[in-house]
From Swiss-Prot:
Pfam families: AUX_IAA. Residues 199-301 form the PB1 domain. Belongs to the Aux/IAA family. The keyword Mitochondrion does not apply. The gene is IAA8. Aux/IAA proteins are short-lived transcriptional factors that function as repressors of early auxin response genes at low auxin concentrations. Repression is thought to result from the interaction with auxin response factors (ARFs), proteins that bind to the auxin-responsive promoter element (AuxRE). Formation of heterodimers with ARF proteins may alter their ability to modulate early auxin response genes expression. This is Auxin-responsive protein IAA8. Keywords: Auxin signaling pathway, Nucleus, Repressor, Transcription, Transcription regulation. Induction: By auxin. Homodimers and heterodimers. Interacts with TPL. Highly expressed in the whole plant.
Length: 321
């Protein structure tokens, strides 16, 4: 069966007594078209499209519609930026705004989800969830900054002394030079008329000997002690040359060796002074010799001819007289 709806004018219903309007389907007075559009209008009126509308702007910036509709957390300075723009405000006394936003279709803020997760009851302070998470970290950061500042101040007060400037080549610091100078001055100081305990090493060489020796002139006080020490140093080499003479030759060599070194019959003891000139040992007093001697050399008597007047010529003159 097919039903046909007839549109009847209301004026005709009033004027004609025969036709009466009857509601067989139990519908309301408003038309079907009007009844279908009413829920949509109500739903659209509840939705806030301006709050979710996309706009061009700087990052984390707020539009005036969002500020008026959602009521921001608290009055803030222009430099502050919201971390969660959709977080509902608790300052207006509306504790159920989060629930209303969920019912109306808006997404919940971070504070609502945090409260539900932690099970915290009652009202929450503005930005309670954020402050709850960030406040311990902020305190730790502030404490660390204060400690660093205190350490920096202490470091400035207790700054180490500046190192001495490096001078000369190879580089030697001035304090090392000072210590070396002080040590040498102490060594040169005289105590009870005796020279200091410093050392004065000089090299000793001998013609025909394949090695060198070093002697400390400060350990000797006369030419006799120096000559006997050199005899012990080079006795093996000189006695080896005289080994053909047997035991008697060795005894004779050891007996006349000192005389040979001093008088130049076979070997002559010479030294090099500060000017680089070679001189015969024994020409000057012992103190001057220790100050000017740079090297010692035991050379053959024939090679010592032409040096400054030495002990050899003086001894020859004495023998003639």
């Amino acid at each position: 069966m097919s039903y046909r709806l007839l549109s009847v004018d209301k004026d005709e219903l009033v004027t004609s007594p025969c036709l009466k309007e009857r509601n067989y389907l139990g519908l309301s007075d408003c038309s079907s078209v009007d009844s279908s559009t009413i829920p949509n209008v109500v739903g659209k009126s509840n939705l806030n499209f301006k709050a979710t509308e996309l706009r061009l702007g700087l990052p984390e910036s707020q539009s005036p519609e969002r500020e008026t509709d959602f009521g921001l957390l608290s009055p803030r300075t222009p430099d502050e930026k919201l971390l969660f723009p959709l977080l509902p405000s608790k300052d207006n006394g509306s504790a159920t705004t989060g629930h209303k936003n969920v019912v109306s279709g808006n997404k919940r803020g971070f504070a609502d989800t945090w409260d539900e997760f932690s099970g915290v009851k009652g009202s929450v302070r503005p930005g309670g969830g954020i402050n709850m998470m960030l406040s311990p970290k902020v305190k730790d950061v502030s404490k660390s900054i204060q400690e660093e500042r205190s350490h920096a101040k202490g470091g400035l007060n207790n700054a180490p002394a500046a190192k001495a400037q490096v001078v000369g080549w190879p580089p030697i610091r001035s304090y090392r030079k000072n210590t070396m100078a002080s040590s040498t001055s102490k060594n040169t100081d005289e105590v009870d008329g005796k020279p200091g305990l410093g050392v004065l090493f000089v090299k000793v060489s001998m013609d025909g000997a394949p090695y060198l020796r070093k002697v400390d002139l400060r350990t000797y006080t006369s030419y006799q002690q120096l000559s006997s020490a050199l005899e012990k140093m080079f006795s093996c080499f000189t006695l080896g040359q005289c080994g053909l003479h047997g035991a008697q030759g060795r005894e004779r060599m050891s007996e006349i060796k000192l005389k040979d070194l001093l008088h130049g019959s076979e070997f002559v003891l010479t030294y090099e002074d500060k000017d680089g000139d070679w001189m015969l040992v024994g020409d000057v007093p012992w103190e001057i010799f220790t100050e000017t001697c740079q090297k010692l050399k035991i050379m053959k008597g024939s090679d010592s001819i032409g040096l400054a007047p030495g002990a050899v010529e003086k001894s020859k003159n004495k023998e003639r007289v």
